[in-house]
Swiss-Prot record:
It is an enzyme of class 2 (transferase). GO terms for molecular function: calcium ion binding; transaldolase activity. The gene is tal. This is Transaldolase. The active site is at K134. Disulfide bonds: none annotated.
Amino acid sequence: MNLLEQLRQMTVVVADTGDILAIQKFTPRDATTNPSLITAAAQMKEYQSIVDETLRQAKADLGSGATSREIVSLAVDRLAVAFGLKILQIIPGRVSTEVDARLSYDTAATVQKARELISQYEAAGVGRDRVLIKIAATWEGIRAAEILEKEGIHCNLTLLFGFHQAVACAEAGVTLISPFVGRILDWYKKKTGRAEYPGPEDPGVISVTKIYNYYKKFGYPTEVMGASFRNIGEIIELAGCDLLTISPALLQELQNTTGELKRKLDPAIAATLDIEKVAMDEATFRKMHAADEMASEKLEEGIKGFTKALETLEDLLRRHLARIEGEATLTHAAEELFHVYDLDGDGIITREEWLGTDAVFDALDANHDGKVTPEDMGAGLGVVLHLAQAK
């Protein structure tokens, strides 16, 4: 039995990807997306239709006076939901959809954006139990999650690097947290100059283990989903964690690796540990956060990274929109041109009706039957014409 099969027996495996084909391959229970993953998927040929249709619909719904910025802003949210809906057709569990990282320090705006995303899922017939709203684990983000959870909107608190963040999330009644294992390791390697950390000594592994044991010791229902892995050694050390979100490359490596996988995290063992409970309020949170150099740096870095990823997606969609609008302009011009030459309105331009040069007519008359149809003109100009037929 390979390691992936064994891991599934003790941990919920989540696919960290927006690539629908990869999700179909590894059949995870849950999946998570973010702007970086959606940007990557949006540039893959097989997903172009989703992107283009989302932009067209956003443009149509906002009306002719809408700016490209307004269209793209609406399309970003709709695209996240569109990919989420596609993913939910494949997986049996939940999909995580991210709130704009630029709202990470604005509780009210985060709540509003989350409600908008959930309303889009519900309009598509998907219940709240199948969606997690992903929010950065700032104090403001945690407060937003507390409000949303009371409304039945489940949250995934991400960019979690410090123990204080985990405690605050648990006390807020958050559904799930995503501590970033690999990014913690990255920070310590850079800080210490140490090239390698064996699995049990990996600072990210140690952090998640501490959080998991604390939650299980005190009976918090908040789920722990380890994220951002650098190697399968980290995954092996966290076998038994509630959930692990893993990239397709590492899923493939686990699938290709055999050997015994021992459970490392166990609620029964956690219950026997001598752990002191921490009282958490805003002052304590901010004091602990300021004292935790790694968590402070990585949270800010993560928010900036998520913001940059979102801006990259917006730029990509603006380019897509410009292409679509260019095609629409060309199509409109071609339709006008056809109507100018179709003098009797029968949907066919004969050589007698054609007022241009013979060379152009001959180029458009691909089958040389002496007639130019809308299809002929569309093919000649690189567009598709859908003309109303004359009565």
